[in-house]
Amino acid sequence: MNPPFSDKNHRCLTSPFASAEATQQGAHRFAPPPYFDGQRYHSINTWLKRKCGEKTIKLAIDGGFTCPNRDGTKGVGGCTFCSDNGSGEFASNIEDQIRLLSDKWPHARYLAYFQNHTNTYAPVAELRKKYEAVLANPKIEGLVIGTRPDCLPEDVLELLSEINRKHFLWLELGLQTIHEETARAIHRCYDLRVFDRAMEALRERGIKAVVHLILGLPGESREMMLDSVRYVSSKPELFGMKLHLLNIVKGSQMEYLYPDYQPFDSIDAYVRLVCDCLERIPPEVTIHRLTGDAPRSILISPPWSFNKRTILNGIHDRLHLLDSWQGKRCE
């Protein structure tokens, strides 16, 4: 499938929402393209529905992996924002998830999401066994694998290339920020050059890459966060982006920063920043997340972040108010 807005020379010049008639007359009427589903950004849900013809759902699973930033190889305790469970608080059994979802979406298609910790951090034989066991389920049509850019050795890349030739696949890379001072503060334990090499390696093999950024890390200004968005957006191989609202959660090292540090003082402040970010992301890049999603049982701050629908509605309303859209100000 050719990505929408694939003409990079013109992708940021006109609103993708303006009808031809409205553009000619200078009017302010909108005819959203079908793949936006009435949204002003290019959501992964819309992309998947166009590609697969049905609603496609990611099923979060725990592959039993750890992380080099936890086992002593690079560090212990993980990144400072990470809880004991990594990023996969909602992971559960595949069949249980399908059973719960099938009544509401009887024709849905499913991707298995290896989410917790670093899901390429194991001997390649072990990785093959785990990936193939999941793909053996006839209801699973592909994989989504969360990992670190420094955990993609050559033999793992070859395995991923093999899977990519036979099944649907994308990798999710936890970058969080491009700023080295912040990276050291959050104990990320790799530098930006490692990320650049990983993106190039995935591009060479035709493997889709989704990059995670965190908004609200201590010490980062609005402009620093926008710099991270611009840098990642400049990667020609970028398939998608996740913008995470920093959640301070129980069990993380950041827990001890609260209440002296809070990521944002209001929903409105966060919504404004997300809209600024979306304007700088090319419109063909798929958007996989625009907020945080920590369970209430472990969330410390910000207390409003579990109100996901209010945040997303706020983003939609502000983009509409500004007559703006994803990619309007991309460079």
Segments from the language model and where they lie:
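N-terminal [4Fe-4S]-dependent radical SAM core
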Residues: 2-111
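Auxiliary Fe-S-binding modules of radical SAM enzymes
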Residues: 2-46, 54-55, 240, 247-331
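Hydrophobic faces of well-ordered beta-strands that scaffold small-molecule active sites
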Residues: 57-61, 110-113, 143-145, 169-173, ...
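Structural recognition of alpha->loop->beta junctions
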Residues: 79, 136-140, 227-243, 312, ...
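Core AdoMet radical
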Residues: 85-97, 101-124, 139-152, 168-194, ...
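Acidic (Asp/Glu)-rich catalytic clusters
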Residues: 101-105, 131-138, 160-168, 200-204
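Distinct, well-ordered alpha-helical segments
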Residues: 124-132, 153-162, 225
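Conserved C-terminal portion of the radical SAM core fold
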Residues: 193-252, 268-291
